[in-house]
């Protein structure tokens, strides 16, 4: 209510009977300290500039220990749903307090948003939104999503001891899980000693042996029981196992727990074996390193960097011990687009922000604008409501909106929710 100035129609007055005029509610602070910074309000016509703290009850000021925290000494207004006590700062000075009652129409509309059993619950307001409102909110959500992905990448860089090349590979691997196996692929990538693998980068067979071995997929008990007998007579499987045994001893390798991999309701082309073989091919060809990615100035060039297929054995297999119709199993256009969105764009933005080079950040946004919007249930639901979805930037914004606002019932922080509430 305070952030969006959803105030009652009646004049606002403090507990000391001062007339309150809100010029600027301030900047919302999501970290430690007062809730809003640099607010501008007039008390009896005099302009005050400072911080504002929001509480359900005035006594929460003491519950949260603000009376002993000097960071709250410059609070110029304490806004509460109920004023049940006088609040004082660490200097013992009483605070100016304002009881803010929720307008009846706002409360009614908010309860509607919480109770409507349809997604999105604000669907009725969508057709009346201005293009400016939609565009500005989508742009903000797009940047917010990229910033979150950047935080995740920076955490990987830290875990990789500052090695951006390694962190990029972990990010790429995670996105090869295409959601279902994302966590497992990330753990697998951390289990790969890439510096050691580099010594064998000219031998695709050895790379695949290390990649599959570290995934725990060269153990017989990882193969469905009906295929185990065939696998034991499979020369390629035996060669891979023996090669991994040698390399694991050489580099003191320990495989991850294969139970982290999920196969249930997974399309065969998404089986870890297939995706790992594609990654092995990509790694062997030396085309998909960080430097090549940074040099890709167009979506077409980025797709060329990431285009790959499986090794010959996997053209006729989805798992060990079971043959299938020959299929080269290239990455599909759909999969390539997802990798561009979730890996290339994210790495460009994160690396650009890290290095202070705007050209990479700008390129990330250009790629999102050039790529087609994703076609998932979230995007389809918003489109059915009349919201225009023109490119991948828009679809990424809608994913952010659902995950960070709709699913958490954060309608009060959403600009579309604001439009619904103020009706």
Per-segment meaning from a language model:
Residues 1-21:
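Short Lys/Arg-enriched alpha/beta "domain-start" segment
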Residues 49-57, 78-80:
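Active-site ExK catalytic segment of metal-dependent nucleases
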Residues 40-51:
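Active-site beta-strand-loop-beta-strand hairpin of nuclease catalytic cores
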Residues 141-397, 410:
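Hydrophobic, aromatic-lined core segments that form the binding pocket/scaffold
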Residues 73-75, 79-137:
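Compact, glycine/acidic-enriched structural inserts
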Residues 67-71:
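N-terminal nucleotide-handling cores and adjacent loading/scaffold lobes of large enzymes
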Residues 396-423:
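Cysteine-cluster motifs in flexible loop/terminal segments that predominantly coordinate metals
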């Amino acid at each position: 209510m305070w952030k969006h100035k959803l105030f009652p129609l009646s004049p606002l007055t403090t507990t000391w009977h001062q007339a309150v005029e809100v010029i600027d509610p301030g900047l919302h602070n999501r970290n430690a300290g007062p809730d809003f910074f640099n607010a501008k309000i007039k008390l009896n016509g005099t302009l005050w500039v400072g911080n504002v703290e929001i509480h359900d009850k005035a006594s929460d000021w003491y519950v949260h220990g603000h009376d002993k925290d000097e960071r709250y000494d410059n609070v110029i207004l304490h806004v509460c749903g109920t004023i049940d006590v006088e609040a004082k700062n660490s200097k013992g000075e009483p605070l100016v307090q304002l009881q803010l009652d929720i307008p009846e129409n706002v409360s009614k509309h908010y309860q509607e948003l919480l109770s409507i059993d349809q997604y999105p619950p604000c669907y009725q307001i969508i057709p009346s939104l201005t293009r400016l409102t939609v565009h500005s909110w989508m742009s903000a959500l797009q940047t917010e999503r990229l910033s979150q992905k950047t935080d995740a990448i920076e955490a990987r860089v830290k875990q990789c001891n500052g090695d951006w090349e390694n962190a990029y590979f972990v990010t790429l691997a995670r996105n090869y899980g295409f959601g279902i196996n994302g966590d497992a692929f990330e753990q697998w990538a951390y289990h790969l000693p890439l510096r050691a693998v580099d010594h064998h980068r000219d031998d695709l067979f050895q790379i695949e042996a290390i990649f599959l071995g570290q995934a725990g997929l060269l153990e017989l008990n990882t193969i469905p029981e009906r295929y185990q007998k065939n696998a034991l007579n499979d020369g390629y499987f035996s060669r891979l196992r023996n090669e991994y045994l040698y390399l694991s001893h050489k580099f003191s390798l320990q495989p991850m727990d294969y139970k982290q991999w999920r196969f249930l309701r997974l399309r065969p082309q998404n089986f870890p074996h297939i995706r790992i073989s594609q990654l092995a091919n990509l790694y062997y060809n030396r085309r998909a390193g960080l430097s090549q990615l940074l040099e890709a100035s167009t979506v077409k060039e980025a797709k060329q960097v990431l285009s790959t297929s499986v090794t010959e054995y996997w053209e006729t297999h989805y798992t060990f011990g079971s043959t299938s119709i020959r299929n080269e199993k290239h990455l599909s256009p759909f999969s390539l687009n997802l990798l561009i969105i979730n890996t290339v764009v994210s790495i460009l933005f994160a690396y650009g922000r890290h290095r202070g080079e705007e050209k990479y950040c700008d390129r990330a946004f250009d790629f999102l604008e050039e790529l087609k919007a994703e076609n998932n249930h979230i995007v389809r639901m918003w489109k059915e409501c009349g919201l225009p979805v023109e490119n991948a930037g828009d679809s990424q914004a809608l994913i952010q909106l659902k995950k960070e606002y709709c699913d958490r019932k954060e309608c009060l922080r959403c600009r579309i929710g604001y439009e619904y509430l103020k009706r």
